[in-house]
Amino acid sequence: DTSVVICTIGFFSNLRDLLQSGADEYSDLSGKELVAKKVKRLVSMAGLFPEGKEFNVYCDVPASKVVAEEWPTEIVFSGFEIGNVILTGKKLVQMNVENSPVKDAYALCFAEGDPEGRMSWDHTAVLVAIKGYEPYFDVERGTFHVVDDEGTNNWVANPNGRDLRLIEKMPPTEVASLIENYMMHQRSIK
């Protein structure tokens, strides 16, 4: 029924394991068949575009290759270059709120030398998984490849490709402000 969107902000190890799993007591479908039936898309913070090496790809190259080659539905890639210029956290650490693990983590980052904000690599993937890429980003359709055993990736533009990669559309400062507003949200207690 393609009702599921999966977002990954780390290595592809668990998704490789899913693809290679067989039927079990929960489903007669293999992992790959289950993904094909249930998953609309995978949104992933992975890769450096148009070509390069990125941490989430090169830390488990075999898993990255399996997912790149065998994932049965669309993959949207939020590359390193997207989140690298979207800096968040500056307003968050100035909030008058106590006992906030997010605020505390960002305060530590600022103390370690990120005075203008922390790069938002993972945040962009989460934003797109929940809200979609419009109006924040443009996309280019193509194919993501892991080209060597060192985890280098490249991108081949192709209007019929399975994959999408995010391309800057809104100014990074506007995307940062939007993400930071979500990060600063405080639930109302009734």
Stretches found by the model and what they are:
Residues D1-K190:
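N-terminal acidic, glycine/proline-rich low-complexity segments
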